[in-house]
Amino acid sequence: LDEMTQHAWRASGFPPQRVLGMAGVLDTARFQALVGLTGVARADEVSAWALGSHGEEMVIPLSQATAGGRPLTELLPAAELAAIVDRARGSGAEVVGLLRSGSAFLAPGRCAADMVLAMAADSGEVMPAAVLADGSYGIRDVYVGLPARLGARGVRGIVELDLRPDELVALREAAERIRARLGALVS
């Protein structure tokens, strides 16, 4: 997704704030649903971010994840949280496997619509989106999933969360892997 979004931006001639991708909203919703299955809170009471890239390079900063206002790290054992993060990373493939033909389209469509509605309403809502990194998180000039404030003209800005060092490293590594794949596409 990140690579396709970067390619679309380059091909479009639009300013980068007008070109963004949707994966993080869906991945976040899937993580919230998985936490909800544990019984510690309803999915709509879970606050979390799916950043980085879609799939194995997804970064869910547990330092920022809460349920009912309480840190998830206080509500669930570390091993259970790690298993939930792993399942969230593979949930797209899991859905495709369950469908047996085709791919998920309802949930991704709903998440994309939520992003469009936030922009149409000029809401300033912060959502995870594939955006052109501007130096935030020490990442620059590559599309990667980051918290983005959305408005009528697209991305108003990138919001910097207070990530733990290991979470920041994982996010930067995801960006570098995206950059490497982009380089391989060009050569």
Tell where the protein language model's regions lie, with residue ranges:
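Short Gly/Thr/Asp-enriched flexible loops that form oxyanion-binding sites at enzyme active sites
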Residues: E3-S12
